[in-house]
C-alpha cells in the first residue's frame, strides 16, 4: 500500500473520508479542508487504489469518498461504477463527491449516471466543499 497515505488528527469524530486525487498538492489542500470538518482522511492516488481500498475495508468504514474524475490508471467515474457494484452493505449508499475541472452539463450528467452523489467543479472554494459535504451528510444529495 505504498500510495496510501493516512492524514489523521483529533479534529472530531465524523469518521473517515477516502480522498482519491492524483495530484499531491491538491490532495494536501483537500485533506486540510476535509479535516476542518472533523474527518480523518485517507488518500490514494488513483481510482484503482480507491476500489481496492474501499473493497478491503469493512462496511461503514468510510463516511465519505471525495473522488477526482480525471486520473491515470483508472478515472473517477469508472472507480465510482465499480465501488457501487461491490458486494458490501455500504457500496451503494456511501456518499461520493466528484471533483473535476470538466464543467459541461454532460460531464455532470455522466457523473450522476455513474453513481456520484454530488459534483463540484475545479477550482472550488473551501466553503463550497464544506457546504457540499455538510449538505450530503445531512440531506443526501448536493451540487454546486
Please provide the spans of the model-predicted regions.
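C-terminal compact regulatory domains
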Residues: 1-144
Amino acid at each position: 500500500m505504498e500510495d496510501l497515505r493516512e492524514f489523521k488528527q483529533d479534529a472530531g469524530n465524523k469518521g473517515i473520508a477516502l480522498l482519491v486525487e492524483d495530484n499531491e498538492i491538491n490532495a494536501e489542500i483537500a485533506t486540510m479542508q476535509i479535516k476542518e470538518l472533523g474527518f480523518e482522511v485517507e488518500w490514494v492516488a488513483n481510482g484503482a487504489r480507491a476500489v481496492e481500498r474501499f473493497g478491503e475495508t469493512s462496511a461503514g468504514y468510510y463516511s465519505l469518498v471525495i473522488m477526482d474524475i480525471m486520473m491515470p490508471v483508472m478515472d473517477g467515474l469508472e472507480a465510482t461504477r465499480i465501488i457501487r457494484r461491490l458486494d458490501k452493505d455500504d457500496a451503494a449508499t456511501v456518499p461520493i463527491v466528484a471533483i473535476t475541472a470538466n464543467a459541461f452539463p454532460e460531464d455532470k450528467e455522466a457523473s450522476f449516471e455513474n453513481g456520484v452523489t454530488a459534483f463540484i467543479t475545479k477550482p472550488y472554494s473551501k466553503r463550497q466543499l464544506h457546504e457540499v459535504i455538510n449538505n450530503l451528510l445531512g440531506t443526501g444529495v448536493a451540487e454546486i
